[in-house]
């Protein structure tokens, strides 16, 4: 099964996740190419400067310094570079000049004859032509127990809201936000993890679930779980007041 990966240059966790995925991918499946968007590690797609200013204003100086140093250090580490990892594993890089939904982008991806698209932190909402490009569909990973906690930064919100459990879901992409039918899902217990620890834990579980979903799709052996709109909750980018409440409750980012 031929797979095209849609991802981004996220500098903190993603390269190691993709490296693991490539090592564990079943022999009957192959990632033949990848689309790599510019980094958007905390949600909204915007300029680097605006992202930095907004992160500082909302999350505070300590958070800003921690992730700024991580960003700078990881810039020089090959193990943290998504494109380097993919090229090392002989995955072709698809360069897009327009939005992924643009006709020219769709034609470039189509030229690799993918059976399945896999989105890992893709930072655009996909429209119908890209969703329907591959015969076996397009799947995505969300680090929450869908239909709850759709949207941005679910690890932040589950900690802030004092949840006892969260989860990881792999689902078929539709034109909504985290709203497609679920292929595989796993519940995760929340104890005293920091947000960073919970991100690392759920992303690792997510890679194993992506592998499981790929096997199920390839063998056409899966039963979809309803992603019930009537039970959905949705969260966007946190406000400063949300971060203040997070800290007052004794929650930790790292």
Spell out what each predicted region is.
Residues 1-254:
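One-carbon transfer enzymes
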